[in-house]
């Protein structure tokens, strides 16, 4: 691997310290690290690394190393986009369902990556677009979830939902979560959505506080084309949030279209633990 990109949580002193150590470690092995410009400005020793815009780094990296939590990883995954570059995600955060590599595993894992000795877990992504008056006004790639929800003081919202052109129902709820299997342990889980193994290919729909108690979470095939039309937006205080990081206000009549993305996120797996161990640890199963 010739080009290794490092993304770190720039406001976390621990992540910055680890980034500096990793840059030196790579330089000692003849490998130049590439970092984002805003990260480079926060590092004390930058002569051993090259810096440029985040999109440029992601465009031709052979490996992406993420230092932080799940949010840092999700942002990096969207930047990598269509290139299917392997991502080594190191957990410096708190919960960390996605960043399963521990700090103790960092250097042995990078060593194996340099030697081409690693395994990846391929995670399905979604494409989400917003149509307004017949025109696409937003288009984004999503790793975790697409969320439609109302403002704090708004009333219930009506979301006319169809799958593959066939009417499903009109959800009357505080919102609706459309999630990948990877995102099933995020906001969807908090709304009583199902836990889906991350290597499955499917899409879940989970209403948030539905008016009708029989509106339960649904799991759709991965090739489902989901269309959600906002029938009623009280005081126009309805928002679309993508991966909890990108958002916009929705208007009555807007249509959110969601399909499976053509590319996946490739996460390098830990050699010391499997997905079920991560679930047990993070959700504290078996504890009293």
UniProtKB/Swiss-Prot annotation:
Primary location recorded for the protein, binned into one broad class: cytoplasm
Residues the entry annotates as binding NAD(+): 70-71, 144-145, 155, 172, 174, 185-190, 245
Keyword field contains DNA-binding: no
Enzyme class: transferase
Localization per record: Cytoplasm
One matching Pfam family: NAD_kinase
UniProt KW keywords: ATP-binding, Cytoplasm, Kinase, NAD, NADP, Nucleotide-binding, Transferase
Active site: 70 (proton acceptor)
Catalytic activity: NAD(+) + ATP = ADP + NADP(+) + H(+)
SUPFAM superfamilies (alphabetical): NAD kinase/diacylglycerol kinase-like
Gene Ontology molecular function terms on file: ATP binding; metal ion binding; NAD binding; NAD+ kinase activity
Functional note: Involved in the regulation of the intracellular balance of NAD and NADP, and is a key enzyme in the biosynthesis of NADP. Catalyzes specifically the phosphorylation on 2'-hydroxyl of the adenosine moiety of NAD to yield NADP.
Protein name as annotated: NAD kinase
Gene that produces this protein: nadK
